[in-house]
Curated annotation (Swiss-Prot):
The lineage of its organism: Eukaryota, Viridiplantae, Streptophyta, Embryophyta, Tracheophyta. The keyword Ion transport does not apply. InterPro entries: NADH_UbQ_OxRdtase_chain4L/K, NUOK/Mnh_C1-like. Belongs to the complex I subunit 4L family. Gene3D superfamilies: 1.10.287.3510. It comes from Daucus carota. It is an enzyme of class 7 (translocase). It holds the Pfam family Oxidored_q2. This is NAD(P)H-quinone oxidoreductase subunit 4L, chloroplastic. One of its GO terms (biological process) is ATP synthesis coupled electron transport.
Length: 101
């Protein structure tokens, strides 16, 4: 596959994730959009690593680290969302101000 096709795909995923993150009112949807952004970045890492220096695996290794951090972020984020849902009975971002009530 050519470099331009992969970069267009990555830019599309990044823009969809960014749009969803900005317009989302649900915390779970915002976490999913954040994961979409991180996956677009991983595609860029692997693509540029393969395109510019295919003998070294720096982009792939860095991508694995980003995946591990994203998994930890998703676990912590979902734990926070479930805690807020138990207390507030809602996962809407504008209703999750914990300083009220």
């Amino acid at each position: 596959m050519m470099l331009e096709h992969v970069l267009v795909l990555s830019a599309y995923l990044f823009s969809v994730g960014l749009y969803g993150l900005i317009t989302s009112r649900n915390m779970v949807r915002a976490l999913m959009c954040l994961e979409l952004i991180l996956n677009a970045v991983n595609i860029n890492f692997v693509t540029f690593s393969d395109f510019f220096d295919s003998r070294q695996l720096k982009g792939s290794i860095f991508s694995i680290f980003v995946i591990a951090i994203a998994a930890a972020e998703a676990a912590i984020g979902l734990a926070i969302v479930s805690s807020i849902y138990r207390n507030r009975k809602s996962t809407r971002i504008n209703q999750s101000n914990l300083l009220n009530k």
